[in-house]
Amino acid sequence: MADIELVDTSLRDGNQSLWGATGLTTAHILQIAPVMDRVGFRALDFTSSTHMGISVRTHKEDPWELIRLTHAAAPHTPLQFIGSGLRFISWEPVHPDLIRLAYDRLVVAGMSRFVVLDPMHDMEAVLRTARMLRRAGAREIIAALTYTISAVHTDDFYAGLAGQMAACPDIDRVYVKDPAGLLTPEAARTLIPAVRARLGEAVLALGDDDPPESGSLRRNTKPLELHSHCTIGLSPLTCLAAADLGVAALHTACGSLANGTSLPNAERVVANLRELGHTVDIDDRLLARVAGYFTDLALAESLPAGQPREYDASFLRHQVAGGVMTTTRRQLDELGLGDRFGAVMDEVSRVRAELGYPIMVTPFPQIVCGQALYNVLGNERYQHVSDQAIRYVLGRFGRPTAAVDPDVADRILSRPRARELTAEPPPASPAELRRRLPARISDEEFLLRATMPAGEVDAMLAAGPARRHYNPGLKPVLDLLAGLRERPGMSGLVIDKPGFRLELREGTRQ
């Protein structure tokens, strides 16, 4: 049996899956980061450009400062950033030089482990981004194989991609990313060996300027990781199957940030792995402390706790995650058309096939579900098309894995709006953007202002430094004090218990 490592996802993907990425503030993270640093995790899945935008927009906190502070609080555990290499914060593609600057600043701030995820599996883009990250100083680069079920996403398809990743010197590891929780234990038993076989192939070792005949064969042993969500209840079993099949690391979450649509519960995964004979070098006492902290935080902040999910076979057909499904159902209910929900879900499967089987991760579920809604409610299919759907067919999000249905592509691109979007100017270079922005701002502020509304960045700066201390046990008391302060005629407060007395009077110190 094997020694299995854990990558904790509580701070980013667990937070995003269960709390909409808005649950954790700087203070929440800094309170537990030193403990997480000592648990024995291989890495902490920490942030993305989307999360950085949420820090500014929702919490009015500086995401760059959060990275620096967390790196200082957890210096022994790599912090992980996930991105596509096409965008930064906004969903619009940005200039490559702006991405280079962002990666440079992320490394300087304290990020050392980077995941390259291209939902279209455009390998040219993946390899280009990996080179960019290596030049920026990234210590560990992981390429993502994003799992889905379709006519084109076969074991051979993923194995072929893995072979290209294995041959890239800038990629250190590969992980199977299963964002919808679709990977069954049975499917894992064919997929993982196929991928690992290509990751272990002999490759030609060459210097940068060496001719092929001067190289030597070496065995490439790039490890494989698994990141699988619990959306339909399969992930805990799939993780155990993956460990038996030679996966080096599993991605998990802690306490209230596990289960539901998040990742498997770390404590339960560790116990099950050991039961099967695997070893996991984790400090169980500290792991329990981390889990307890997030459970207490959820209770204090009235945030939902992830619960184990029951198996839902229909999900394998439409692959629409809970959040997008809930939004679609609500939209239909508001229109008095709730009875059409089943028809929309059936149309989702058809639209996805016609668009070349995009993997259902943001923004593609929104594009596919929106188009399905238009098709079901309109007089004819593709009579109405969103700008994002047009941009998708134009290739603005990358090259689709399979060709878009020619008739559908013609219907979408023949409309006047498509011609307008075709004429959109390319992304502005950093030099052009700097000419539009205030002089003498730091690179970090420039990156925020180049990709976010000015008012949001101004509000963040005006809010001042983020709080750095948090205790979930004090939250009810602080809420009580805040509520009492708002009551008219309240001139004093006394808290009295054995061994402790606090008396507050208006205008006095006691």
State where each predicted segment sits.
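Active-site beta->alpha loop and helix N-cap motifs at the rims of alpha/beta catalytic domains
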Residues: 43, 47-163, 180-183
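Glycine-rich phosphate-binding active-site loops on the catalytic face of alpha/beta enzymes
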Residues: 245-263
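Catalytic cores of alpha/beta
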Residues: 157-161, 232-245
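Conserved, mostly hydrophobic/aromatic
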Residues: 14, 116, 174, 246, ...
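Core active-site phosphate/anionic-ligand binding loop and the adjoining beta-turn-alpha structural block
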Residues: 237, 270-273, 280-337
